[in-house]
């Protein structure tokens, strides 16, 4: 990866990691379901007027909107409102990668290797360590909600794979539009008619998560995926919890205990081990034109989780929506 693109990938991980602190700030001003509604409404409109159709089967667009939009973010924000710290949330949701592997094996018949089983076991050990050391500051119920959010994320990844969107940014706009109306209904049902007093802090929080993290973030992610294989770009998403926990410690005063650091290392290393091939093991694949000439199409676990490319110039891969943001 070229140096400026590497900086772009690291910067995007920082934006998505800081996003958890921003969401925690937003929850001081808005109920969680209303906050998600505002996020997706602002991300969808007016962009929806300019991007055209989703260019994917509607049943999978609706399924992705329901799981990745309504259920994932609804559960995540309710869990954070219930007491789950921002930094810890950014770490726990990374277990979605493990759920995705399990669901792809069960629902799509993908092959599961010993390496993946080992990596998933290490990641779940880190998750169990967090669960066993939760104190009064992080209620068990809030932890369960965030884990459930990660599970919904895994289900949503399967829907995205089936949708196989050629343009991740356009798909993100439509996903946001699909999620906005159900979230508004759920907010009215469970939180009542809101009595809003817009503050500068709350408004900036909504603008950040909608425009910078969602639209800008996935725009950059798609830009990188158009120039490099998913197996090159995807590992940078593992920097998200690193930035998330660091930003939470720096800006929100969230303590970084040795147990949290150990659990974080187990989850990140487990996910990374399960999602990469051993060094030196490559498979022959047809060449694909790139900015620096022909390059092989991704192989191994990342290739298995990415929908087949119907043509060599497809701009994005559906894996664009399968990483934390």
Regions found by a protein language model. Name each.
Residues 57-67, 112-124, 142-143, 166-176, ...:
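Cytoplasmic-side transmembrane-helix entry/capping segments in multi-pass membrane proteins
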Residues 26, 35, 79, 106-108, ...:
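Hydrophobic/aromatic residues within transmembrane alpha-helices
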Residues 36-40, 132-133, 202-204, 238-325:
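C-terminal-most transmembrane helix of multi-pass membrane proteins
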Residues 10-18, 22, 62-82, 102-103, ...:
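Hydrophobic alpha-helical transmembrane segments of multi-pass membrane transport proteins
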Residues 43-47, 100-101, 106, 137-192, ...:
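Transmembrane alpha-helical segments that form core, pore/gating elements
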Residues 41, 47, 103, 112-132, ...:
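Hydrophobic transmembrane alpha-helices of multi-pass small-molecule transport proteins
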Residues 34-38, 60, 88-91, 114-117, ...:
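Signature of the 12-TM Major Facilitator Superfamily
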């Amino acid at each position: 990866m070229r140096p400026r693109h590497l900086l772009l990938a690291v910067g995007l991980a920082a934006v998505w990691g800081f996003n958890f602190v921003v969401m925690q700030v937003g929850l001081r001003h808005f109920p969680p379901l209303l906050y998600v509604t505002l996020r997706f409404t602002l991300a969808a409109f007016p962009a929806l007027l300019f991007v055209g159709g989703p260019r994917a089967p509607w049943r999978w667009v609706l399924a992705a909107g329901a799981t990745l939009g309504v259920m994932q973010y609804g559960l995540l924000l309710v869990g954070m409102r219930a007491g789950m710290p921002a930094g810890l949330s950014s770490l726990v949701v990374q277990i979605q990668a493990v759920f995705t592997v399990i669901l792809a094996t069960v629902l799509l018949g993908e092959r599961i290797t010993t390496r993946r089983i080992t990596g998933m076991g290490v990641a779940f050990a880190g998750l169990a360590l967090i669960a066993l050391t939760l104190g009064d500051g992080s209620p068990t119920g809030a932890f369960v909600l965030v884990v459930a959010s990660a599970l919904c994320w895994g289900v949503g990844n399967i829907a995205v794979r089936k949708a196989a969107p050629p343009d991740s940014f356009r798909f993100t706009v439509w996903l946001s539009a699909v999620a906005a109306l159900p979230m508004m209904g759920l907010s009215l049902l469970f939180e009542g008619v809101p009595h809003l007093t817009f503050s500068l802090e709350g408004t900036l929080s909504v603008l950040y998560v909608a425009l910078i993290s969602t639209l800008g973030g996935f725009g950059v992610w798609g830009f990188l995926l158009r120039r490099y294989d998913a197996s090159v770009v995807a590992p940078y998403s593992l920097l998200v919890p690193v930035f998330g926990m660091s930003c939470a410690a720096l800006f929100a005063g969230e303590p970084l205990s040795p147990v949290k650091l150990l659990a974080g290392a187990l989850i990140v290393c487990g996910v990374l081990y399960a999602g990469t091939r051993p060094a030196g093991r490559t498979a022959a694949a047809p060449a694909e034109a790139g900015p620096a000439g022909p390059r092989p199409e991704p192989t191994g676990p990342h290739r298995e989780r990415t929908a087949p490319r119907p043509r060599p110039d497809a701009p994005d891969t559906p894996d664009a929506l399968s990483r934390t943001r």
